[in-house]
């Protein structure tokens, strides 16, 4: 905002990421809130009602008007999820419209609300928003679906990972009526909170009652341990183990969904590519 003053500014979420640099989630919130400092005189500060750190941001926001998404000004009603994405009624200050979103998961509905709030505050109509949300191709590394065959779906969510995004991805995997496998790598840059954060994800995976959890790296061992899964320090060994399980389930005519996710440095996409090449 030193280079160009925005007419609308938004903090989409505040999560346990980059804690090594910012020290705490409050530090992350303070740093993200600096974006509001450069608003134009009539600019609008947009806040996620589920990640509301207004006490840290009030100084930066000053007298600017505030709008909220997820609850308040922009929200989703009648939400229905499927293997192809989500449908919902988008409610805004300028009316409502039905949306068919081609992205998986509840978290992407919330991302759509964030995008809507920004777009409408700089002049977009509801029709513009609908066109923008519905006519976007899925992005590799972001819950990208790879349908290998009728009974096998790979979900490539390997671009990066933090606690919130990994839990959101687990929630997507949980919703499938299939044998559900999670391949999870370490989450990096969590500093002193690393163990706690990985344990939190392990508990979330346990609550999701996934069928198999395989972890790779160092810190992620506690995730697989929480669900009586299996940990690996060699990615090729993890992939080979997963491949054997998948082949067994397919021979039993079971549907299988595999989700891979981890921090960027873990390169968990290599597991997806290997499985795809071996099973196509």
Can you annotate each of these PLM segments?
Residues 19-26, 166, 191-195, 269-270:
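Glycine/threonine-rich flexible loop motifs
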Residues 2-153, 178, 203-206, 211-212, ...:
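Acidic, Mg2+-coordinating active-site environments of NTP-dependent enzymes
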Residues 8, 114, 250-262:
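Short SAM/SAH-binding signature in class I
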Residues 45, 154, 182-183, 258:
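Residue-level marker for buried hydrophobic side chains located in beta-strands
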Residues 2, 239-252:
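Short amphipathic alpha-helix with an adjacent loop that forms part of the alpha/beta core around
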Residues 140-142, 265, 269-273, 280:
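ATP-dependent carboxylate/acyl-activation modules
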Residues 139, 162-228, 235, 263, ...:
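Active-site beta-alpha connecting loops in nucleotide-dependent enzymes
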